[in-house]
Amino acid sequence: MKALIVPQEYIRNFSIIAHIDHGKSTLADRLIQECGAVSEREMTAQIMDTMDIEKERGITIKAQSVRLNYPYKGQTYTLNLIDTPGHVDFSYEVSRSLSSCEGALLVVDASQGVEAQTIANVYIAMENNLEILPVINKIDLPAADPLRVAEDIESTIGLDCTDVLQVSAKSGEGIKNLLERIIECIPAPSGDENAPTKALIYDSWFDNYLGALALVRLVNGTLRVGQEVQVMSSGKKYEVLALYYPHPVQKILTQTIGCGEIGIISLGLKSVTEMAVGDTITDSKNPTKVPVEGFRPAKPFVFAGIYPIETDKFEELREALHKLKLNDSALSFEPETSVALGFGFRVGFLGLLHMEVVKERLEREFSLNLIATAPTVVYEVYMTDGSKVLVQNPSELPEVQKIESIYEPYVRASIITPSEYVGNIITLLSNRRGVQEKMEYLNQSRVMLTYALPSNEIVMDFYDKLKSCTKGYASFDYEPIEYRQGDLVRLDIRVAGEIVDALSIIVDKSKSYEKGRALVESMKEIVPRQLFEVAIQASVGNKVIARENIKSMGKNVTAKCYGGDITRKRKLLEKQKEGKKRMKAIGKVELPQEAFLAILKIDG
């Protein structure tokens, strides 16, 4: 299929902003169906969510794009829809999607109202000066209250909702009005088609047949097949081998991509790293002077060790991580070794959901069995000699006498909750060393709390605890703010006298005793009994702060003695005692995988 260049005034680039589960992917399905982009036979639910794991969890992870045509008032308009993820971990996918649009649909569930993540994404859209159209979805639900939600949007975000769009993505009600409103309200792109080529790469992935592909937004000029282009960050030059328009089922081949359009470019590269997200592509003979601005690359926020259970699968794990990295620019990893777990990788993630998704994809797509250690954040450690060390792995924390001070990263957390759960949340946040910044009532029944919290306190099980203390009604979003000095220590776990490096965690000094106590108690339940007594200890430095003993398994060595002399039995029992002593001195204890997960389960 060939496509013609569309004049800029007939192009609309927009994305959909919504909290998880507010019906964003279903709305995208209805828009695609209404525009006739996909035949009835090809249409599947959540057609934009291509990964199995996205469909199973009902979440969008990778931002997808699609080009739609819609006739309106005698003209055919091209609508480029960019679907964005709604979960807090994937907000970098949102920021890069929004940097290539002129408008955004703000989709809010008619029965639930505005959530914390929605507000965070609206602010990103406002920073990019986008036209925001509020849309109230799921109006067919029995609990729908569109008027309350419209007031909610006005009071929380400040958007005018007098003529707000009400739709049902499930039944298709209101979809035609929505498409017409997109054409009328969202501005056309404002690029200069005669200026030098300037294209922003806002996504890239690896195709087994075509190599590395990049999704670009043409800011100025045009792109055509055979043109020699230059990647601005590296200065390297390539020939454009093929150009496509995005389509949910099959890419549409084209010879040129016009100004203001979105398209897929193939330069015949073997690796995505040469087409980094956020980079600018320009013409090599007549380059643009300034690259496209307004894009922030993703920084890893949480680190964890990932190790193969079968130690000979290390190279396969390396290969698998490299393949995932091709499609996930936020993933970072480097090799590391652990005394307890052997060879593995220290992997950087955007958050806990990202970590879960990556681990699940590694296990599912590459058939690997993995152990993940407890997630940690990056600490700044200032040494007595004046130097500064960044610590990602607790076992790398220098000795106490060499440390001047430790700084830990803080986040600003926004939590929106029904007002009856405020007390529970305040208790949870104060237990997690949170500092209240503000608390505001959005309406009679909903409250927004803003807290500064150490990142360390939210990477374990904060989200689960928040959901359980609010019966699942609270929503949560965070952004990194700064490093602050903390009174922190490393808590080590010793099994049979040896430190298990993969179980070390960095904790606030005031909490070290209760965390150590909880850890040794849960480890006692998990570690299998041995033929000798095993001590499980929690220690800070050289000081043991908690201890539990696992009793040895008893073997009846006197079973073969039938009556007779007591000294014979005594001799056998003494011999057994000696053997156990020797075993205790040299015996190794195999730790089951649950032992490494015990850290995640202890209460903060």
Curated annotation (Swiss-Prot):
Domain tr-type G positions: 9-190
Primary localization: membrane
Pfam families for this protein: EFG_C, GTP_EFTU, GTP_EFTU_D2, LepA_C
GO terms, biological process: positive regulation of translation
NCBIfam families reported in the protein's UniProt record: lepA, small_GTP
Stated role: Required for accurate and efficient protein synthesis under certain stress conditions. May act as a fidelity factor of the translation reaction, by catalyzing a one-codon backward translocation of tRNAs on improperly translocated ribosomes. Back-translocation proceeds from a post-translocation (POST) complex to a pre-translocation (PRE) complex, thus giving elongation factor G a second chance to translocate the tRNAs correctly. Binds to ribosomes in a GTP-dependent manner.
Protein's UniProt name: Elongation factor 4
Species the sequence originates in: Helicobacter hepaticus (strain ATCC 51449 / 3B1)
Origin organism lineage: Bacteria, Pseudomonadati, Campylobacterota, Epsilonproteobacteria, Campylobacterales
Gene transcribed to yield this protein: lepA
